[in-house]
Amino acid sequence: MVKDIKVMVVGDMSVGKTCLLISYTTNSFPGEYVPTVFDNYNANAIVNNTPINLGLWDTAGSEEYNSFRPLSYPGTDVFIICFSLISQTSFENVIKKWHPEIIQNMEQVPPIILVGTKLDLRGKGKSEEKEVTPEMGEQMRAAIGAYKYSECSALTQDGLTTVFEEAGRVVLFPPSKEELAKSKKDSKKGDKDSKDCIIQ
């Protein structure tokens, strides 16, 4: 029997959420940027020998949709919070905007996967902003208590499959109480470090 999993993808405008989903579901990279309002994709996968159907919800990151976006949150099994590895601003908004929005609109907060996008551009001098390192990403994961931190590229597909496999895995095999306790402990420990790295 196939397990249906609702995956909600959120993050700032232009961090590559739609490209991420199109690349994963169609194995192709979109040629031009098209701002998303709301869109849905579906993908079948097998995680630990269990067939799953991922219902992937693409959301608009712009402020004009702030009041409408959370209407799609009920029933979400796992959130993917995206930021661009070449945008410090989008990274900061993980803890300033996206994590608080999830907390405020969900009675029970489902697992969260934190994802750094545009891996192929990091270190290429393509951004005027400070780039985000793997260490900074892990600190942010701890600060918000996310289940996993991953980095990927929609263009090269490096790390792409891992993102969605982890999303399916955390729903199929929820963390134990011990793992959750450790995550919360890491969260408290990482909170100061993460805020320090954000304001550097």
From Swiss-Prot:
Iron is among the record's keywords: no
UniProt modified residues of type Cysteine methyl ester: C197
Sequence positions that bind GTP: 11-18, 58-62, 117-120
Propeptide residues according to the Swiss-Prot or TrEMBL record: 198-200
Residues bearing a lipid moiety (S-geranylgeranyl cysteine): C197
Short sequence motif Effector region: positions: 33-41
SUPFAM superfamilies: P-loop containing nucleoside triphosphate hydrolases (SSF52540)
Keywords: Cell membrane, GTP-binding, Lipoprotein, Membrane, Methylation, Nucleotide-binding, Prenylation
InterPro entries per record: P-loop_NTPase, Small_GTP-bd, Small_GTPase, Small_GTPase_Rho
Family designation: Belongs to the small GTPase superfamily. Rho family.
Protein name: Rho-related protein racH
Taxonomic lineage from the root: Eukaryota, Amoebozoa, Evosea, Eumycetozoa, Dictyostelia
